[in-house]
Design a protein with these regions (language model features):
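Extended catalytic core of nucleotide-activated donor transferases of GT-like folds
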Residues: 7-9, 27, 40-130, 134
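A structural signal for isolated positions on well-ordered beta-strands in alpha/beta enzyme cores
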Residues: 7, 37, 94, 117, ...
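Residue-level recognition of beta-strand->loop/alpha-helix junctions
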Residues: 38-42, 141, 204-206
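Short catalytic/ligand-binding loop motif for oxyanion handling, primarily in non-cytosolic enzymes
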Residues: 15-18, 37, 45-48, 75-78, ...
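Short hydrophobic "strand-cap" motifs at the C-terminus of beta-strands
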Residues: 9-10, 96, 121, 140, ...
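Conserved catalytic-core segment of nucleotide-activated headgroup transferases in glycan assembly
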Residues: 20-28, 36, 146-215
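Short hydrophobic/aromatic-enriched beta-strand-loop microsegments
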Residues: 136-142
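N-terminal subdomain of nucleotide-sugar transferases
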Residues: 1-43, 64
């Protein structure tokens, strides 16, 4: 018989956004005392795999009653191909998925049939899923955990101490044209001209730029 608890499926070690989509719920389950384990369904991802905080919960067995798939919705076909039908059978399957457009393509909607419900990270995503499927959809932003984080000063990154700072983060692997950092810079320059008296700064943080030097 399957155990009471939760299996989180996604990229537990992946140092990119979708990896956090699994890690934050995992840390919240740990704080709440809910039994859980994590399943790395695609360990050969090209993204860096150096976040080992959840290693002690890694498993290859779908032993719990509840599966939560913490992935981008575009990865649903790959998910089904790698895991097979048996992984979904006789379990309460939840998609905690990300999709940034107003509708899902039909080719992806067909892969929702194995799910019992969907969790959406934002109201926009919730509306999108409701337009795309009759499954129950719940708006559930990522949890905030009380884990201790390493603190850095502004001085370390040469950010003026008294400025109002805007932060934009993106991953080059997510396609620069889609993340559009140039538009962020233009919007900042438009809002705060060089003659402006406002003390403001724009900080852009990116990862994986070394793999996209032509961009």
């Amino acid at each position: 018989p399957k155990k009471n608890g939760v299996l989180l499926i996604g990229y537990p070690r992946g140092e990119f956004g979708i990896g956090s989509l699994l890690r934050f719920p995992a840390l919240a389950l740990e704080e709440a005392g809910v039994p859980f384990k994590v399943f790395d369904f695609n360990p050969n991802s090209q993204a860096s795999q150096k976040d080992h905080r959840l290693d002690k919960w890694l498993t290859h067995l779908p032993e719990y009653r509840i599966n939560i798939f913490c992935i981008g919705a575009d990865q649903l076909p790959l998910l089904k191909k790698i895991l097979g039908k048996g992984f979904f059978h006789d379990r309460h399957n939840i998609l905690y998925g990300a999709w940034e457009l107003s509708r899902m393509p039909k080719r992806l909607i067909t892969f929702l049939k194995d799910m019992k419900e969907i969790w959406a990270m934002s109201s926009f995503m919730g509306q999108m899923f409701r337009r795309s499927t009759s499954l129950p959809v719940y708006d559930l932003p990522l949890p905030i955990c009380s884990a201790q984080l390493e603190s850095y000063s502004r001085h370390k990154f040469q950010i003026p101490e008294n400025d109002f700072v805007f932060l934009f983060m993106f991953d080059f692997d997510s396609h620069v044209a889609r993340k559009n950092p140039e538009a962020v810079i233009k919007a900042f320059e438009y809002a705060f001209s060089k003659s402006s008296q406002n003390s403001v700064s724009l900080v852009i943080k990116s990862i994986n730029g070394d793999r996209h030097l032509n961009e």
